[in-house]
Swiss-Prot record:
Family matches, as SMART domains: VWA
Short name of one Pfam family: VWA_CoxE
Subunit structure: Homodimer. Interacts with RavA.
Family note: Belongs to the ViaA family.
Keyword field contains Nucleotide-binding: no
Keywords recorded for this protein, A-Z: Chaperone, Cytoplasm
Compartments where found: Cytoplasm
Species, as recorded: Pectobacterium atrosepticum (strain SCRI 1043 / ATCC BAA-672) (Erwinia carotovora subsp. atroseptica)
Name used for this protein in its record: Regulatory protein ViaA
Entry keyword annotation includes Membrane: no
InterPro entries: Uncharacterised_CoxE (IPR008912), Uncharacterised_ViaA (IPR023481), VWF_A (IPR002035), vWFA_dom_sf (IPR036465)
Length: 492
């Protein structure tokens, strides 16, 4: 079987010119012209796809087989080119039968050429007539091939136009939410190429509208997303300057058993002391030790952190900005993060996705409660994954240690080794294991990894939050929400 591309090559038909005509016709359609006028930032992104479209169409030509009738006629034409006038005259009846059997458009013209009035019956076929016959036959084959090419391209044009309309409609709706600049518009256009976006994108639009009504949350995401760490160059000067350090010390609020000590706390008596109280000979001994605060009791003690100001030599530095890496965002989906906290956390992730698209970065989401669920919002099917993420419900417990362990494992990947880690939570959770804390501190010290905390509550445990480099606070309490709404309304 011969392909359409091979037939065009054998007939010296320029397929590139035909493909260029198709692209020009496609770009001039009123539907695309309307979208380009409404969303000019998407036009340049679409034009970048033109080479890919042409290559796709060429691949279609390579795989499309010509009809058997046309292939049979072309084979007959090729054999007729390599014979002389006498052999051509001998085979002329067979050629006419072939043209008749394949119902060739050239049949009528061929009959007129061989039965012309100037040619007497039985007269030999001259070289001029032979050349004219082959020339007209080649022209007929060329017209048939071009017609077949046009039919195929028209089908592809309709398919491509339908796909472009769907992508432009989706990209146009999401452009105000996700396209901050030309680079973001281009990446949004690439994301719209996913062929299986089955979920309604209205979730993205709803959270985009919610984010616009929370300018403080959007500003916080901008500050976190645009922040850069610096590389320090040391100098020789080292003056004394005040230095603040967080110091851990025992707290008065009991949290856990930390040992045994002597006291008069009846509620925390050890069982051995209660035994002496039940023996009449030792009862007075029990009361004596009670008065002397010498009863063995459990010691319950908590931890708290305070700032301690000291002075130490500080070396002056010159700072060089480091390039921004991707985001790995851990979102707490426990029951305490439901309601308004849930909407704020999802909108914050949407804002980080917008920044990632604008800065050509990647954005990876990890949801944690009693398990860990993962989404990459900037992958090829990022829009579908973003919609699935926004449709998640927040309920369950809080296993922050498992999420941080999964985050650290992800940062071992070469593609994510310079990522910024962001944890969004109310930080009302159990104490982190020392192993996880030590791993985080090791990465901060040795690899300069950055860990950010976005606190959705003022009641988070300091013992958990102290491991983060930066703590970004967004209070979701009723009073703070009313104050932000009042300030937002006053600004307008």
């Amino acid at each position: 079987m011969i392909t359409l591309e091979s037939l065009e090559m054998l007939l010296s038909i320029d397929e590139n010119e035909l493909l260029d005509d198709l692209v020009v016709t496609l770009m001039a359609t009123p539907q695309l012209a309307f979208f380009f006028e409404k969303y000019p930032s998407l036009k340049s992104a679409l034009l970048n796809d033109l080479p890919h479209w042409k290559e796709t169409l060429k691949q279609r030509l390579r795989t499309t087989q010509v009809p058997p009738e046309l292939e049979r006629e072309f084979s007959c034409y090729q054999r007729s080119q390599s014979i002389d006038n006498q052999a051509f005259q001998t085979r002329l009846p067979a050629i006419m039968d072939t043209l008749n059997n394949v119902e060739s458009p050239f049949l009528t013209q061929a009959s007129q050429l061989i039965t012309s009035p100037e040619r007497t019956l039985g007269q030999k076929v001259t070289s001029g007539l032979h050349a004219l016959f082959l020339q007209r036959w080649r022209l007929s084959l060329t017209l048939q091939t071009v017609s077949l090419h046009q039919q195929l391209m028209n089908q592809e044009r309709e398919i491509l136009l339908d796909e472009l309309q769907q992508r432009l409609t989706l990209s146009g709706k999401l452009e105000p939410i996700l396209a901050e600049n030309e680079n973001a518009a281009g990446r949004l256009w690439d994301l719209s190429a996913a062929q299986r976006i089955q979920t309604d994108p209205r979730l993205l639009l709803d959270f985009g509208t919610f984010l616009q009504r929370q300018p403080a949350l959007q500003k916080l995401a901008e500050r976190l997303g645009r922040s850069r760490e610096t590389k320090s160059i040391l100098t020789q000067e080292a003056p004394q300057e005040a230095f603040r350090v967080r110091v851990r010390e025992p707290a008065t609020v009991p949290e856990q058993v930390s040992g045994v000590h002597q006291s008069d706390d009846i509620l925390r008596l050890m069982p051995t002391e209660l035994v002496t109280l039940g023996i009449s000979e030792l009862e007075y001994e029990f009361y004596r030790r009670l008065l002397e605060h010498r009863l063995l009791t459990y010691r319950l003690q908590g931890e708290s952190w305070r700032e301690k100001v000291t002075e130490r030599p500080v070396v002056h530095q010159q700072n060089e900005q480091q390039p921004r890496g991707p985001f790995i965002v851990c979102v707490d989906t426990s029951g305490s993060m439901g309601g308004f906290n849930e909407r704020c956390a999802k909108a914050f992730c949407l804002a980080l996705m917008r920044i990632a698209l604008a800065d050509n970065r990647r954005c990876y989401i990890m949801l944690f409660s009693t398990g860990v669920v993962k989404y990459e919002l900037t992958s090829e099917d990022g829009l579908e994954q973003a919609i699935r993420f926004l449709s998640q419900s927040f309920r369950g417990g809080t296993d922050m240690a498992a999420c941080l362990s999964a985050l650290l494992d992800k940062m071992d990947d070469a593609l994510w080794h310079d990522a910024d880690a962001v944890v969004i939570s109310d930080f009302i959770a159990q104490r982190l294991p020392d192993e996880v804390v030590n791993k985080v501190k090791s990465r901060q010290k040795q690899l300069q990894h950055r860990f950010h905390a976005v606190a959705m509550s003022d009641h988070g445990k300091p013992g958990i939050m102290h491991i983060f480099d930066h703590i970004w606070r967004f209070d979701t309490g009723l009073k703070s929400r009313l104050m932000r709404r009042w300030q937002h309304g006053k600004a307008y």
